[in-house]
Amino acid sequence: MNLPIEQYADLLAEKAKNLTALLAPFNPPELEVFESETSHFRMRAEFRVWHDTNEVGENELYHIMFDQETKQRYRVDQFPIANHLINKMMSSLLAEIKGNELLTRKLFQVDYLSTLSGEIAVSMLYHKKLNEEWQAEAAALKARLEHQGFKVQILGRATKQKIALDRDYVEEVLPVDGRNLIYRQVENSFTQPNAKMNIKMLEWARSCTRHSSGDLLELYCGNGNFSIALAENFRKVLATEISKSSVQSAQYNIEQNGIDNLQIIRMSAEEFTQAMNGVREFNRLKGIDLKAYDCNTIFVDPPRAGLDQDTLNMVQAYERILYISCNPHTLADNLQQLTQTHRIERAALFDQFPYTHHVESGVWLIRK
């Protein structure tokens, strides 16, 4: 698989041109553009596993992907989009499990999650129930990979079954504005795929909010990626997240980073809107006095569908809005309403996904 590295600058310029045109009706300042590394930038990858027989009758297996247009499978021995650690593990893993019936039989997928800190989780997915014999073989595999120098976690997954030999997460350390931030990242839950671009996003968000007063509300906080980085810019931070594993990771990350002004609530943005408007009461909010927060800044990083109408109405009530978007078209839709009351102070493009049409962007809005 070859990347069109020589075309990267032109591809990024085209994205910037398109985003600038999309935002033009809202009179933004000049777009800030943050470029990615041109290869080995992705921290996670997943591959199907193909089983074959070579010319001398030996069983072979290799990673495959599918062409998005033709749907034809193709073999992947190296994956230049993924970071060097994943590429190294791809070849080491297959070499170690080759010929091992317990580890390879009905293995259909392998997922990799890596970090800049040098840790990697390998999740092996099976169409069979995993037993103690599998665990023993997987433990031996883990030991062999560790002997090669890998800081590795091995996980096995099958229908209604998940086995973590040691733990089901890796720990990332991100240098943000001169400070190392620790993030627990759980296998099979959302993490930012381009870690170095994530650092640029965090630093940009911090620079937008540097001289803020009052408190911050964040919706969809995940493992605390943004709220932890932003906490020192505010008196207090209140954040919501619906995923149980993400909330647990966020609580751990808050503790590890010594953050004492950040509270996470497990509820959806829609539920929180109802609570703020007094429409419903929630047991999950017992012990949390929402009136004690003076949240005049809100941070949103919604799904591709953008903000729903009720949340959009709620967001509009805040003095300052920091909006990170993974879909510029729904961002533009939301801005039609938000710019009735707010102006765009800053706008940015973060090339989280080079060589694709996907665009990550951010806008910093201030009440008019």
Swiss-Prot record:
Reactions mediated catalytically: uridine(54) in tRNA + S-adenosyl-L-methionine = 5-methyluridine(54) in tRNA + S-adenosyl-L-homocysteine + H(+); uridine(341) in tmRNA + S-adenosyl-L-methionine = 5-methyluridine(341) in tmRNA + S-adenosyl-L-homocysteine + H(+)
InterPro entries listed in its UniProt record: MeTrfase_TrmA_AS, MeTrfase_TrmA_CS, SAM-dependent_MTases_sf, TrmA_MeTrfase, U5_MeTrfase_fam
Residues annotated to bind S-adenosyl-L-methionine: Q192, Y220, N225, E241, D301
Catalytic residues as annotated in Swiss-Prot or TrEMBL: C326 (nucleophile), E360 (proton acceptor)
Top-level taxon of the source organism: Bacteria
Record SUPFAM superfamilies: S-adenosyl-L-methionine-dependent methyltransferases
GO cellular component term of the entry, any: cytosol
Annotated GO MF terms: rRNA binding; tRNA (uracil(54)-C5)-methyltransferase activity, S-adenosyl methionine-dependent; tRNA binding
Root EC class: transferase
EC identifiers of the protein: 2.1.1.-, 2.1.1.35
PROSITE patterns: SAM_MT_RNA_M5U, TRMA_1, TRMA_2
Keywords: Methyltransferase, S-adenosyl-L-methionine, Transferase, tRNA processing
Family recorded in the similarity comment: Belongs to the class I-like SAM-binding methyltransferase superfamily. RNA M5U methyltransferase family. TrmA subfamily.
Free-text function comment from the UniProt entry: Dual-specificity methyltransferase that catalyzes the formation of 5-methyluridine at position 54 (m5U54) in all tRNAs, and that of position 341 (m5U341) in tmRNA (transfer-mRNA).
NCBIfam families assigned: trmA_only
Name of the protein in question: tRNA/tmRNA (uracil-C(5))-methyltransferase
